[in-house]
Amino acid sequence: MPKAKTHSGASKRFRKTGTGKIVRQKANRRHLLEHKATKRTRRLDGRTVVAPNDVKRVTKMLNG
């Protein structure tokens, strides 16, 4: 059976940490930021851990 390929879209969006958690960027911080509150854009800054319900699916796409 051939090796499973990594989902290229998922590999660009998700990273695995040293402890095994899967992290992602938060949405809504790419463009049209002019009308969004500074407080909101600060909150959307940085990375966050993937929801527990999605971990299995994302791991499968990353062949982990």
Curated annotation (Swiss-Prot):
<keyword id="KW-0687">Ribonucleoprotein</keyword>
<feature type="region of interest" description="Disordered">
    <location>
        <begin position="1"/>
        <end position="20"/>
    </location>
</feature>
<dbReference type="GO" id="GO:0022625">
    <property type="term" value="C:cytosolic large ribosomal subunit"/>
</dbReference>
<keyword id="KW-0689">Ribosomal protein</keyword>
<dbReference type="Pfam" id="PF01632">
    <property type="entry name" value="Ribosomal_L35p"/>
</dbReference>
<protein>
    <recommendedName>
        <fullName>Large ribosomal subunit protein bL35</fullName>
    </recommendedName>
</protein>
<dbReference type="InterPro" id="IPR001706">
    <property type="entry name" value="Ribosomal_bL35"/>
</dbReference>
<dbReference type="InterPro" id="IPR021137">
    <property type="entry name" value="Ribosomal_bL35-like"/>
</dbReference>
<dbReference type="InterPro" id="IPR018265">
    <property type="entry name" value="Ribosomal_bL35_CS"/>
</dbReference>
<dbReference type="InterPro" id="IPR037229">
    <property type="entry name" value="Ribosomal_bL35_sf"/>
</dbReference>
<dbReference type="GO" id="GO:0006412">
    <property type="term" value="P:translation"/>
</dbReference>
<dbReference type="GO" id="GO:0003735">
    <property type="term" value="F:structural constituent of ribosome"/>
</dbReference>
<comment type="similarity">
    <text>Belongs to the bacterial ribosomal protein bL35 family.</text>
</comment>
